[in-house]
Design a protein with these regions (language model features):
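N-terminal binding-site loop/beta-alpha segment at the start of enzyme catalytic domains
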Residues: 1-41
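Short, acidic/polar
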Residues: 1-9, 52-66, 107-114
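Hydrophobic residues in well-ordered beta-strands that form the structural core
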Residues: 19, 30, 45, 104, ...
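Acidic-and-aromatic substrate-binding clefts and catalytic sites of carbohydrate-active enzymes
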Residues: 20-28, 49-54, 79-84, 131-135
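Acidic (Asp/Glu)-rich catalytic clusters
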Residues: 31-39, 60-68, 115-119, 144-146
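A short, structured active-site edge motif that brings together acidic residues
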Residues: 40-51, 72-76
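CE4/NodB-like, metal-dependent polysaccharide N-deacetylase domain
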Residues: 56-74, 92-96, 117
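Beta/alpha (TIM)-barrel catalytic core signal, keyed to glycine-rich beta->alpha loops juxtaposed to Asp/Glu
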Residues: 77-243, 250
Length: 259
C-alpha cells in the first residue's frame, strides 16, 4: 500500500514527504520505493537528542534507510535547536552532504522567540488548525517573512480530534463547547466534516508555504486530497478567523497525556 500511496502522491504532483529518524519503518519503506521506482521526493526529516545517538549518527542511519539525501533537516523541538551541539553537528552534515534547509518543529510562540534569538532557521514547522491560529498573528507573519523563514503547518486535524464525537471532546476538554459548536455549525453550513473544514481552510492560507498531512491508508489519503478541491465561503472564512482556543489545553496535544 505504501507504493500505491507514493505513486498517487507523484501523480497529484505532491513532491514533499515529512518523516523523522524515530519512524524507522517509514524511512525504510520510503527508501525501498526510491530504490525500486527511481521516483524521488523532497524529504523533510527530524532529529532529536533523545537517547544516546548523536545527530550525525541518526542522519547516517536515515540516509542508509532512505538511500537518498533529505532536502530539509528539522530539530524535533526548540530545546534541540538551541543546543550548540545540534548546530555543531548540523554544520558538519550540511558541509559534507550539501543539505539545503535547516529548521525546527515548534509548539508555541514563546519557543519561536527563543530560537530566533539563538539562530535564524530556514524553515519552521508549527501547529495550525481552525482552533489554533497563534502563528498566524499579523506581526509574527511579518517577522517571519522579513527573515525569509518558510512556514509549514502541521496538526491540521488536531491529532485526529476533529474526527472524534463531540461528546468525547466535551468530556475530555473544559470550556470548549461554545466555540467548538460554532465550528460544527460552520462545517455543516459548508457541507463538510470538521476535519475537512480545517484542511480546506489551512490549504488556502496565503502566508503558509506548505501543510503537512498524516496518512493512515490510501482511502484516507485520497479522501483528504479530494477535499482540497472544495472551497469555503468568504463569510465562513471570516467567522473561522474570529474563533480560537489557543489558550485551552485542547490545542496543546503535548499536554494531553498530563490530564
Amino acid at each position: 500500500e505504501v507504493f500505491k500511496i507514493l505513486n498517487y502522491l507523484k501523480k497529484k504532483k505532491i513532491n514533499y514527504l515529512d518523516t523523522a529518524s524515530a519512524y524507522n519503518q517509514s524511512e525504510a519503506k520510503i527508501g525501498k520505493y526510491f530504490q525500486k521506482t527511481n521516483k524521488k521526493f523532497r524529504v523533510i526529516t527530524k532529529f532529536s537528542f533523545k537517547g544516546n545517538n548523536s545527530i550525525e549518527k541518526q542522519f547516517i542511519k536515515s540516509l542508509h534507510l532512505l538511500g537518498y539525501l533529505p532536502d530539509t533537516i528539522l530539530a524535533h523541538n526548540y530545546r534541540d535547536y538551541i543546543n550548540p551541539k545540534f548546530h555543531e553537528q548540523i554544520k558538519n552534515i550540511k558541509k559534507k552532504y550539501l543539505i539545503k534547509n535547516i529548521g525546527v518543529s515548534l509548539n508555541k510562540i514563546s519557543e519561536l522567540n527563543k530560537i530566533l534569538k539563538y539562530k535564524k532557521p530556514d524553515v519552521i514547522q508549527v501547529p495550525l488548525n481552525i482552533l489554533n491560529k497563534s502563528f498566524l498573528d499579523e506581526n509574527i507573519i511579518k517577522r517571519l517573512k522579513k527573515k525569509s523563514i518558510r512556514i509549514l503547518g502541521r496538526s491540521i486535524f488536531l491529532q485526529g480530534l476533529f474526527y472524534k464525537d463531540k461528546k468525547f471532546v466535551f468530556k475530555k476538554f473544559k470550556n470548549v463547547k461554545k466555540k467548538y459548536m460554532q465550528l460544527l455549525k460552520i462545517a455543516s453550513h459548508e457541507k463538510m466534516t470538521l476535519g475537512e473544514l480545517s484542511l480546506v481552510w489551512a490549504n488556502h492560507l496565503k502566508d503558509v508555504d506548505n501543510i503537512i498531512l498524516g496518512v493512515d491508508n490510501f482511502p484516507h489519503l485520497k479522501k483528504n486530497l479530494d477535499s482540497l478541491k472544495k472551497r469555503i465561503s468568504k463569510e465562513s472564512y471570516n467567522l473561522i478567523k474570529k474563533i480560537n482556543l489557543e489558550n485551552n489545553k485542547i490545542t496543546k496535544p503535548y499536554l494531553w497525556k498530563k490530564q
